[in-house]
Amino acid sequence: MVAHLKNPGMFTSVSAFAPITNPVAVPWGEKAFAGYLGSVEAGKDYDATELVKNYSGPKPAILIDQGTADGFLHNQLKPENFAAAAAKAGYPCSVRMQPLYDHSYYMISSFLRDHIQHHATALGLRNM
């Protein structure tokens, strides 16, 4: 998501599984940005929620799948922050909350086909 939002027009489609969508607002991001970039403020350039607020390029719909049983959901991933920022910016985004899935292989393997279809459709390919 960050690669797309920092490089308008480079990507035709975008999707993610359980992404850290607002790292400047969570402990993982605060620690990483302060340690690697010198400040949390510098991390805004690598935060999808911050980037979508001012994005002005092409807007391919973003598909996000997130498990409701993911132990990182509420204190680290924050998909609701991204969804709200995207909606306010008029950016099409679908955040699908998947009941009982966590942050594991089974989450990805269960919904990978949907993500492949999302990209195939964006590329104008027939249904996979």
Question: Where do the PLM segments sit?
Answer:
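Non-catalytic cap/lid and distal C-terminal segments of serine-dependent acyl enzymes
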Residues: 1-128
